[in-house]
Structure formats: C-alpha cells, structure tokens
Regions:
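N-terminal Rossmann-like FAD-binding beta1-loop-alpha1 element of flavoenzymes
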Residues: 2-43
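Conserved, well-structured functional cores that handle cations and Mg-NTP chemistry
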Residues: 55, 122, 126-133, 149, ...
Length: 172
C-alpha cells in the first residue's frame, strides 16, 4: 500500500475496526461503511441496552480477545488498551485460571503476559474500538450504508477493486 491511498472498509464490527487501525496511521484515508446506525453517544452500559446492530447477531453476548490480539493492542495501541480497561473490560491471565493445587506450584514466566485474554460485552469492545478509530487521522464513518458489491476490473490477469456498490436510503 502507498501513502495517500483511500481505503474502504466494509463493516464496522471488530474485524472492520481492526482493519482500519492496521491500515491507518495517518498516511491513508480510511472510510468505514456500515449498514447499521452509529452507536449512542452515552456510556458502554447505555450502548448495551440501546445500540441496534442488525449486522452483529451476537451483539449482546460476552466476547474475548485471545492472547495474541490482546498483546497486539497492548504493544501497538497502549492508549486503546487503557480506554478498554477504564470502560470495564477485564484481563484474564494464565494464573487466574489455575485451581488451588496448580496455583500453589505455579511459577510465573515472562511470556505469560502474552497469554492474557481481554473480555467484556461485545458492545463495550466495539464501542471503545470505534471511538478510538474515529479519533485517528483520516478515519471517517458512513453509517446506514449497506455494501452490495464490488466495483472491480481485470488488467493483465490481475483483479483490481476500485470501489464498492453501496445502498443508502434504498438507492444503490
């Protein structure tokens, strides 16, 4: 990828928000399209009860980021990790899951830090990720916009995606 590119991300779920953060960094314009309305302006608690996301069928379930993603957030986005923890997500380390007998003989290892899980309600994880992404340079959200297909071309045996077909207010 080159600087000054414009990247379209279809969906503002956890994967789409993660992609926007990975592709961003201030050198590219990132537009995140989502068929659902934006989250409420209030707290993560309010979002749990009022945010409607047709595109996220497991919205009100608990979710966990496994060790690798938790480590990536901790190392690359420490401010995001601090916000996630401040808003109620919890870290669960290897030692936290040991029963009494194993816990007594357990000797921590430096690499145990990379085994921690980050867990919370999905609404909390998405809300904080989204607010963090929205503050990054060049990131824009377009809500109530359903992606209906790709605008693509072939050149020299290669496929190039030039855009997306988007539906808004019943018009593609």
């Amino acid at each position: 990828m080159r600087a000054n590119e414009h990247i379209l991300v279809a969906g503002s779920g956890i994967a789409g928000l993660g992609a926007a953060l990975a592709f961003g960094g201030g050198t590219r314009r990132i537009t995140i399209l989502d068929r659902d309305p934006p989250p409420p302006a209030g707290s993560a608690e309010e979002a749990f009860y009022s945010w409607e996301r047709r595109g996220a069928t497991q919205l009100r379930h608990s979710h966990a980021f496994l060790g690798r993603l938790t480590t990536l957030i901790r190392e690359r986005y420490p401010d995001l990790m601090a916000e996630l923890l401040h808003e109620g997500t919890r870290l669960f380390g290897f030692a936290d899951g040991l029963n009494g007998t194993l816990a007594q003989s357990y000797v921590p290892s430096k690499s145990d830090e990379d085994l921690k899980l980050l867990f919370s309600r999905r609404t909390t994880l998405e809300l904080i990720l989204r607010r963090y992404a929205a503050r990054q340079p060049g990131v824009t959200f377009i809500n109530d916009a359903g992606v209906r297909g790709l605008i693509a071309r072939r050149e020299g045996g290669k496929l190039f995606v030039d855009g997306l077909k988007v539906e808004r207010n019943g018009v593609v």
